Amino acid sequence: EQDFPGNMTAKVTYTLDDNGEVAIAYEAVCDQTTVANFTNHAYFNLDGHDSGVMEGQKLELHASYYTPVIDSKAIPTGELAKVAGTPFDFREMKEIGRDIEADDTQLRYAGGYDHNYALDKADGTMQLAARARGAKSGICMDVYTDCVGIQLYTGNFITPQTGKGGVQYDRRHAFCLETQYFPNAVNEKNFKSPVLKAGDTY
């Protein structure tokens, strides 16, 4: 597919337990060495799907660095930039929209946040990567992963559409937290490689 080498067999397992925890597990093998970087692109609005813009909801990311992008095509430069002193600092919980309109080149490229964060604890074990909280509902969501990165996307390109119960969904009505290898890692030597060798299991 899309000229990637090999024939890959992939499996995704979704598990919902009695505590309301959702687990997503990926497994893949390929008969040739190829690139494997699976993620999840679910949209969240912790105040409910009919609550409109989610910018008042709060987010904490366990990441001291992020990967700036070259331009609006969102390909990382290869740099790991400190979040400290920038609108990208979510190390302490803050409203997602607090700095989203800041005069910042990176935010202008994406029309908001659509950037990968380098997780502070990325040793291959399951770690708490993010915590989000609804502004009105008080619902709290924790995100755990064994990946090295997490992409924050603030729904900047959601176009008006009719959703559940006839509710109109629009720009920034939801956000995504996508655990992953860093984008374009296959071309950046200082990023952890997403290459899956033939016969190995992802």
Language model features by range: what are they?
Residues 1-202:
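An exposed, glycine/acidic-rich loop-and-rim segment of catalytic or binding clefts
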